[in-house]
Amino acid sequence: MKKFTYSILIPSFNGLTLLKKHLPTIIKHSQRVDAIMIVDDGSTDGTVEFLKKEYPKVKVLHNRNNFGFPKSVNLGVRNVTTDLFVLLNNDVSVTNGYLESAIKRFDNPKVFAVTLNETTSSWPQVSWSEKLQYVRGEEKDRAHYSAWASGGSAIFRKSIWDNLSGFDEVYSPGYWEDIDIGWRAWKAGYTIIWEPDAKVILEHESSFNKFDKNNLNLIKQRNELVFYWKNITDPVMRREHLHYLLRHSLTHPGYLKVIIAAINKLPTQVKNEEKLTDRQILAMVNQPFS
């Protein structure tokens, strides 16, 4: 296995309680890491003061304002100087050996990211029927190619991340930015792997739980449409998606609000070279990795 340098990046907004709970475990099981960095997204709960006092070796980047997840991650990655970086939500705990089993996958220079095994879940089995459909894959003990790497628990190759221009901040405050960069990576000829032995525990306590549920649902649906309109270029798939929009708008009149919100987010500037088509990506993901 090649020797890589790697760091850990944790974006956090008013996550003092979560960091107190999960950071000790991350430090314990990440002994060979070169650096641990917290990007504090304008917290008002004493996070920065706590970290400086209790964890002086942890680097803290403090945003004066709340920028949202995609921009905070991008700001953090600009300060990463290692070959790889581990992106973790502040509500994630890790297990012993989670890094070693994933980092070996980067021996292949085409691997952009390795998404970790959130033990209550598995790899996303993706298909297309007027829009992306996915369920959790049943074969949980074997590595698989994955359409994307989770923005809350994955390892990324810094050089490729930079080539792809990072997360597209059009998705702020968050949701679908990880799917977007994953799809762009595949189109550019890179691969993503889900690694079953790299086990982490997701507590589902992130800052997004503090959002109004209706507003959060609007953000999710809006960003989903932005993803399709930006990334899906196959003519047949685009027509199928248009049929879905027309039908869904007629049967769910409130959906027009989602469409308008998505239109207002366009155009987005982050586009990358396309070596693979949408159909080729769909044929490659979901397959076992050997």
Residue map of PLM features:
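A conserved acidic beta->alpha catalytic loop
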Residues: 25, 40-49, 65, 92
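Short aromatic/hydrophobic "clamp" motif used to bind/position activated sugar donors
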Residues: 85
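Short, flexible, basic/aromatic active-site loop/helix in glycosyltransferases
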Residues: 129-147
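A short, conserved alpha-helix in the catalytic core of glycosyltransferases
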Residues: 147-165, 170-201
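Non-catalytic, C-terminal membrane-associated alpha-helical segments of glycosyltransferases
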Residues: 234-290
